Amino acid sequence: MKKVLSILVLVLATVQMAFAGDVITRDAKQLPLTARNFINQYFTKPQISHIKIETGILGSKSYEVLLTDRTEIDFDSNGNWTDVDCKKAAVPAALIPVSVKEYVKMNFPQEIITKIERGRSGVEVELANDYSLKFNKKGQFVSMDD
């Protein structure tokens, strides 16, 4: 029993050490080309403060980029954005689906979208008033959290 427990602890420690190697850099060349192009297209003024490269269990990478204006952008292993958080500034309008923009304009005319996250089920946006709105893949409103 002690031998099995010792082996289990050793295996867990080895696995944990293997994936504790997140890399933090300022070198934009560490990002996939798609991610670099995205940043250059939508965020021309703020510079990259740092990039955190996380390696997953199967070796896939994800990238978390912090810009000097505190904007945070997450990218998947292919360099496609998954999350853009501009804190209290507006997310670039070109990133927001038309139906989502229209819904926010009609129902929250005084608010700006400060964060957008896209996933398999659709899009979630956060407004400056901290309301969170969820939309399905077709851009239809699903729910709201405050």
Model-assigned labels for residue ranges:
Residues 1-23, 39:
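Bacterial Sec-dependent N-terminal signal peptides
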Residues 21-146:
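Interaction-mediating elements
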